[in-house]
């Protein structure tokens, strides 16, 4: 069953730098939300608060209605998958070993059947790819392995921290398509960090624009594009439109 995720008045600092300044956000079960904004706006800090990679100075985080600090780490890993920017694969482990890591950490054994299912779901045939090492894969294939690992214990929510940003256009499209298939099949809750509004429009139901540790505006892509609440939101969409126009004219 997909999870609800909720942040209540989160505040966090790195030294004198404010990363989150009273952020509140409720994410419905089964929905897909994209966090967008410039580097340093607080996107990754907010995302990592939901799986306790970061413990905020103040405020509350609720996962499935329960305080996140009341959930055992093993159970939290079993319920929430995480895909970092560079995949985070162990280079000297095979694809199968990398994907099996989460089932082992969450007490589900070696999870052979779950590993096979997860690889098939991201269109990587276990018999062909299972014994390969990360360096033998393309960038898109590595990110698909990372996605399979995040889902190998049938997680109810997935956090993605700019997982496709470093990929070339073809690999990114392949990774997007794999993610869409997986989400359609599993129905988990999604929280995605991205700089790319086009990616947010493709993969998310709602967009949250962040700036200087605060939420500038939240809503559907269409609503934000048609009625930006601030000049900053308007500028983000203007830049995205200009980039699209330049590409079309090239």
What is each of the regions a protein language model found here?
Residues 59, 212-213:
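Conserved ABC ATPase "signature" C-loop
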Residues 218-219, 227:
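ABC ATPase "signature
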Residues 133-137, 141:
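Conserved ABC ATPase signature
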Residues 36-38:
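The feature captures the beta-strand-to-loop junction immediately N-terminal to the Walker
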């Amino acid at each position: 069953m997909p999870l609800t995720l909720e942040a209540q008045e989160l505040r966090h600092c790195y030294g004198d730098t404010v990363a989150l300044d009273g952020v509140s956000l409720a994410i419905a079960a089964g929905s897909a939300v994209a966090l967008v904004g410039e580097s340093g706006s607080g996107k990754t800090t907010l995302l990592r608060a939901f799986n306790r990679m970061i413990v905020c100075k103040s405020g509350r985080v609720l996962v499935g209605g329960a305080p996140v600090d009341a959930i055992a780490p093993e159970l939290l890993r079993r319920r929430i998958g995480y895909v970092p920017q560079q995949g985070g694969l162990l280079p000297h482990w095979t694809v199968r070993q990398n994907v099996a890591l989460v089932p082992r950490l969450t007490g589900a054994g070696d999870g052979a059947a779950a590993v096979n299912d997860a690889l098939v779901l991201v269109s990587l045939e276990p018999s062909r790819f299972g014994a390969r090492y990360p360096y033998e894969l393309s960038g898109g294939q590595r990110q698909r392995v990372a996605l399979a690992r995040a889902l190998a214990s049938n997680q109810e929510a997935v956090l993605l921290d700019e997982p496709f940003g470093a990929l070339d256009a073809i690999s990114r499209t392949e990774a997007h398509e794999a993610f869409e298939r997986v989400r359609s099949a599993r129905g988990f809750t999604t929280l995605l960090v991205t700089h790319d509004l086009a990616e947010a429009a493709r993969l998310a139901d709602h967009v949250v624009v962040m700036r200087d540790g605060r939420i500038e505006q939240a809503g559907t892509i269409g609503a934000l594009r048609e009625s930006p609440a601030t000049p900053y939101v308007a500028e983000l969409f203007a830049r995205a439109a200009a980039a699209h126009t330049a590409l079309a004219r090239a």
